[in-house]
C-alpha cells in the first residue's frame, strides 16, 4: 500500500474545509482511499471478465461503484 501521494489527499481535506491537516491524517485517508479504489477496481475487473473482455471499461468502473 501507500502508493497515493499525500499532497493531493491533503488538498482534498482542505477542500472539505480544513485549515490545517496533519501528515498522519492525510496518510490515513490516503490508505483508506487506496483500499476502496482497489476494491472497486477488482469488481470492475470481474465485470469485464464476465463480459468476455480483458479491458476494463468506464461502464465496469461505474457498475462496480454502484454495487
From Swiss-Prot:
It comes from Pyrococcus furiosus (strain ATCC 43587 / DSM 3638 / JCM 8422 / Vc1). Belongs to the archaeal histone HMF family. The keyword Flavoprotein does not apply. It holds the Pfam family CBFD_NFYB_HMF. It comes from the Archaea. Binds and compact DNA (95 to 150 base pairs) to form nucleosome-like structures that contain positive DNA supercoils. Increases the resistance of DNA to thermal denaturation (in vitro). GO terms for molecular function: DNA binding; protein heterodimerization activity. Homodimer or heterodimer with another histone. Dimers then assemble into higher oligomers, with the DNA wrapped around the protein core. Disulfide bonds: none annotated. GO terms for cellular component: chromosome; cytoplasm. Residues 20-22, 54-57 are annotated as: Interaction with DNA. This is Archaeal histone B. NCBIfam families: archaea_histone (NF043032). Coiled coil: none annotated. SUPFAM superfamilies: Histone-fold. Gene3D superfamilies: Histone, subunit A. Keywords: Chromosome, Cytoplasm, DNA-binding. It is found in: Cytoplasm; Chromosome.
